[in-house]
């Protein structure tokens, strides 16, 4: 089983350059999937969309979907949470997990403030979004702490240093 990643580069107005190749994203998501897939419905393969964008687009999405008219770092739209009538999953079909949208502008600012690389920040945000696609949430401090610890595990699994958790709480 594997995860196919539809990588969309939509950060043309951003001043930051994404230091992560498409193949690296694919490797990371597949490694994270290996660690977390037992909780997913069975399928022959899985897919997700990762959209790297700028503050303008993510602010528009954040306003429309969350009624918060400002940029944010990451949004996740989990396909498995959508309440639509569907038949039981067919193990021979591709299962779409959802979409992750990351503002490269906000990630750049957060990496500078947290004194870690843009690569680490983008991976951290992608891991956070990926967990949301798999059903994780953080409605309270205890669940947020658990989710942040899981993100640390995911970053370590792909050989990235763990940013200081205090900068994310």
From Swiss-Prot:
Cofactor: Zn(2+)
One Pfam family from the record: YbeY
A GO molecular-function descriptor: zinc ion binding
Intracellular or extracellular location(s): Cytoplasm
Gene Ontology CC entries for this record: cytoplasm
InterPro entries named in the record: MetalPrtase_cat_dom_sf_prd, YbeY, YbeY_CS
Role summary: Single strand-specific metallo-endoribonuclease involved in late-stage 70S ribosome quality control and in maturation of the 3' terminus of the 16S rRNA.
The name this protein goes by in its record: Endoribonuclease YbeY
Species for this entry: Cyanothece sp. (strain PCC 7425 / ATCC 29141)
Gene responsible for this protein: ybeY
